Amino acid sequence: VTHCSNIVGTVNNLKKISELAHEKNAIVIGDGVSFAPHGFPDVKELGVDFYTFSLYKTYGPHLGLLYGKKEILDKLPNQNHEFLEGDVPYTLNPGGPNHEELSCLVGVYEYFMNLFEHHYPGENPSIREKIHKVNELIAEHEKEIANPLLDYLTN
C-alpha cells in the first residue's frame, strides 16, 4: 500500500488501511518511498506488517530498507546459506550486507543530528523527537520553495 502519492503528495491513512486489512487477515506492506523523505514513519503506530523504502530518498546511499514484524519474518523461507537458517535478518540477505553502503548511514544520522543542534542548541529530546523536529524544518523549507510555483500554477 502506497503511504504517500509521489504525484500529488496525498498521504494515505495507512493505520486505518492496516486495521481494515487485518480484519480480513491480510498482511500489509507499506511502501514508504514517497513518504519517508518528508516524514519519519512510526511503523508500529501504522500497524503495518512490513514497511519499505529506498534510503537514497532520505539522503542516504542507494540501499533498500525493510521493516518486518519478527513473527512474520521468522516464518519466511531462508534465502541465504543453510547455516543461517532461522537467523533473521540474515536469512533474507543472500550474499550478506553491503558494508560500504551501510557505513554511509552514519552520515545520514550525523546530518540530522547536526541540523537539530544548529536549530535547537542545548535541547536533548529522544532521537525520534530530534528527527521529527528536523523533518518539520525540512517540510517548512520545502513549502517556502514550492509555494511560488504552486501559486503560479493555480492562478
Please tell me what each predicted stretch does.
Residues V1-N155:
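Pyridoxal 5′-phosphate
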